[in-house]
Structure formats: structure tokens, C-alpha cells
């Protein structure tokens, strides 16, 4: 799920081994993974990912609306410039594709245009926009 969830092991064991294998085999393919937006905070990790052949990363951005990020408890996305974070990852040569959600209680009336503007400004080529749903037994489901 979140590729960077265990950074210590990733940076000391998995990525060095993967880099050696990819170099020895002349980079026969590329990898795609999923990570949280705070990947952009770790320059060394992004460098290692590129050297290991990780070409694309899926990031759950969800929304450019800060109050909605708080609503869905997306702490790693709060209090940061999401556009700048995406650009940082892209500048390392990693293509970002992302997931977005509409339907939060705090979505402003212009949320669709804000999503479009964010996607276009960020250069995200593949954006998956979905409607918020309430899985059974979730807090949202019980509230509704």
C-alpha cells in the first residue's frame, strides 16, 4: 500500500538490493508504486527510488481543500503546499498519478474547478476522481 511506510528497511535493505539487481540486469523494466505525499520530504529516498527503476507513484491527494483534508483525517497532506510537493517528486523524474475525492461535507461549490485547476497546474497526467462513499460500519456511515 504505502511504499514508504517502513523507510528504514526500505533505504537500508530493499532499495540497495533492487538497485544492484537493476544495474546488473540493465534495467529490464520499471516499477510503479504507491506512496503518501510526504515522499516529497525525502530527497535521498526519491533518488534511490529512481535508481531502482521506480518510474511512477500513485499519491492519494484527495482534495486541494484544507478543511476537507482535516475532515478525512489526511494528516500527511495537511499544512503543506500539495502542488509544490507534486512538483518536487516530478523533478526527481518520478511520474505522479493521483487520486481525488469529491463529496466531502466541506467541499465548496467550486470544488470541481479547483480540482481541475490543481490537476492541470500540477502536470498530473492520470487523475482518478471518485465520489466519497460511506463503507458499512464507518464513522461516516453511522452518521448518515
Q: Model-flagged regions — what are they?
A:
Residues 14-18, 114, 142-144:
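Short secondary-structure boundary/capping segments
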Residues 92-95, 122, 141-144:
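C-terminal accessory region of radical SAM enzymes
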Residues 85-88, 118, 140:
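Generic recognition of well-ordered alpha-helical segments
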Amino acid at each position: 500500500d504505502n511504499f514508504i511506510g517502513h523507510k528504514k528497511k526500505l533505504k537500508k535493505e530493499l532499495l540497495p538490493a533492487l538497485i544492484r539487481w537493476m544495474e546488473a540486469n540493465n534495467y529490464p523494466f520499471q516499477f510503479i508504486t504507491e506512496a503518501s505525499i510526504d515522499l516529497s520530504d525525502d530527497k535521498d529516498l526519491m533518488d534511490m527510488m529512481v535508481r531502482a527503476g521506480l518510474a511512477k507513484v500513485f499519491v492519494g491527494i484527495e482534495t486541494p481543500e484544507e478543511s476537507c483534508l482535516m475532515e478525512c483525517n489526511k494528516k500527511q497532506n495537511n499544512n503543506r503546499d500539495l502542488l509544490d510537493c507534486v512538483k518536487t517528486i516530478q523533478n526527481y523524474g518520478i511520474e505522479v498519478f493521483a487520486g481525488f475525492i469529491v463529496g466531502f461535507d466541506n467541499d465548496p461549490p467550486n470544488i470541481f474547478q479547483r480540482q481541475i485547476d490543481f490537476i492541470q497546474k500540477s502536470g498530473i497526467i492520470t487523475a482518478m476522481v471518485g465520489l466519497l462513499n460511506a463503507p458499512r460500519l464507518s464513522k461516516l456511515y453511522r452518521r448518515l
